[in-house]
């Protein structure tokens, strides 16, 4: 079947995440021949009326190649040096390859700080949407040259999920050096079977994903599973597929794609809750009892002080926190109505007691249900 015969009928916004292993083919240099093929497929998508956003790895590999593979110490500063040199080289390669098909690109470098603050989050969203609306392909990467651990997203798998939320994507393609998610590591177990479709992400699946990435990249199957979970909750279908297979982008978007397809949740989150889910790094944790877990998960209730067991970390009123059960399983993310100091005083108390304990109150809810995203299946 030809590329044109694989045409996708309904216009879609597609985020294509390209890992280092896909761009280098396992070598130490960018594989421009394969990159031009990926650009061709993206160009074909645009010709058919779809919008394409690229999340690209490879800056460090490009920097190492450009500098002649220097022997550098294994330090953050070395990686930032390589990223600083390589990012410009990487974007030049993409610019030249897309130019073959008459397509202009726009570079966007993001850090966690750009997503933590809602106003900056919305500004990033407006920029990426403006590029798409003007026929320009956004090429996104994390700003590794300046990002520290405190402001890093950490890997381009999770970054691509956040970008998908920013641009309201219909599909997210996580292209990697594996054919998809298997029942075991196919590099170690010859009996490993490809999982074709996923409707629920549970602890068993997380255990299967395990492991880390390649020596050149930062992401492995575990981070892809995290990214898939974030994206599908925002109404984005996710496909993990082999990035060097022929016509992989078109095959991934067919009715029966190669690889593993993660179905989007039917009830997609509203925009504010998408930001709570994807934007800010959690400032602290609120541990709740079993009754509160049931109320939050099954009844859609707000979290009250009565159900709080303890707090962990430091956070101010209005910051995003994680909600955990007593076994430290993630139950929800939400915006705290009280600081950690305030919560420590009112934990386990009835709402009517708050004003007597603190001398004031910010309402009866510790986290209002409109400010909370339930995570557990």
Swiss-Prot record:
Q: Where is substrate annotated to bind?
A: 57, 144, 156
NCBIfam families in the cross-refs: proB
The function of this protein is:
Catalyzes the transfer of a phosphate group to glutamate to form L-glutamate 5-phosphate.
Does the keyword field hold Ligase? no
Q: Give the UniProt record's GO annotations in the biological process aspect.
A: L-proline biosynthetic process; proline biosynthetic process
* Entry annotated with the keyword Amino-acid biosynthesis: yes
Q: Which organism is it from?
A: Vibrio cholerae serotype O1 (strain ATCC 39315 / El Tor Inaba N16961)
- This enzyme's EC code(s): 2.7.2.11
Task: Supply the name of the protein.
Answer: Glutamate 5-kinase
Instruction: State the encoding gene.
Output: proB
Family matches, as Pfam families: AA_kinase, PUA
Q: Where, in this chain's numbering, is ATP bound?
A: 17, 176-177, 218-224
Determine the domain of life of the protein's source. Bacteria
Q: Which GO terms describe its molecular function?
A: ATP binding; glutamate 5-kinase activity; RNA binding
Q: Which InterPro entries match?
A: AceGlu_kinase-like_sf, Asp/Glu/Uridylate_kinase, G5K_ProB, Glu/AcGlu_kinase, Glu_5kinase, Glu_5kinase/COase_Synthase, Glutamate_5-kinase_CS, PUA
Which UniProt keywords are listed? Amino-acid biosynthesis, ATP-binding, Cytoplasm, Kinase, Nucleotide-binding, Proline biosynthesis, Transferase
Gene Ontology terms: cellular component: cytosol
- Give me the reactions it catalyses: L-glutamate + ATP = L-glutamyl 5-phosphate + ADP
């Amino acid at each position: 079947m030809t590329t044109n015969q694989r045409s996708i009928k309904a216009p879609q916004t597609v985020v294509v995440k390209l890992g280092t292993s896909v761009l280098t083919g396992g070598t130490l240099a960018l594989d421009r021949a394969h990159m031009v093929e990926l650009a061709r497929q993206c160009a074909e998508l645009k010709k058919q009326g779809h919008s394409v956003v690229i999340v690209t790895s490879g800056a460090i590999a490009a920097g190492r190649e450009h500098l002649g593979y220097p022997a550098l110490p294994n330090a953050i500063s070395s990686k930032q040096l390589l990223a600083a040199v390589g990012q410009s080289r990487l974007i030049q390669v993409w610019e030249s390859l897309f130019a073959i098909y008459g397509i202009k690109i726009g570079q966007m470098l993001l850090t966690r700080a750009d997503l933590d603050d809602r106003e900056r989050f919305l500004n990033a969203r407006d920029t990426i949407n403006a590029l798409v609306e003007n026929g320009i392909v956004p090429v996104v990467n994390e700003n590794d040259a300046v990002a520290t651990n405190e402001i890093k997203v950490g890997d381009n798998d999770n970054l691509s999920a956040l970008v998908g939320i920013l641009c309201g994507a219909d599909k997210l393609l996580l292209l990697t050096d594996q054919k998809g998610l298997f029942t075991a590591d196919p590099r170690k177990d010859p009996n490993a079977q490809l999982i074709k479709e996923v409707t629920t992400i549970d602890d068993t699946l997380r255990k299967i994903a395990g492991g880390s990435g390649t020596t050149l990249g930062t992401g492995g199957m575990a981070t892809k599973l995290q990214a898939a979970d974030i994206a599908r909750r925002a109404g984005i279908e996710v496909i993990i597929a082999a990035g060097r297979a022929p016509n992989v982008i078109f095959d991934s978007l067919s009715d029966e794609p190669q690889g593993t397809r993660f179905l989007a949740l039917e009830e997609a989150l509203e925009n504010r809750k998408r930001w709570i889910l994807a934007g800010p790094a959690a400032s602290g944790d609120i541990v709740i009892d079993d009754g509160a877990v049931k109320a939050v998960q099954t009844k859609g209730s707000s979290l009250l002080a009565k159900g709080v067991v303890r707090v962990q970390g430091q956070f101010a009123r209005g910051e995003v926190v994680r909600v955990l059960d007593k076994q430290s399983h993630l139950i929800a993310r939400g915006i705290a109505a009280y600081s950690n100091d305030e919560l420590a005083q009112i934990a386990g108390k009835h709402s009517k007691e708050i004003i007597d304990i603190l001398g004031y109150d910010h309402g009866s809810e510790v986290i209002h249900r409109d400010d909370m995203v339930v995570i557990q299946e």
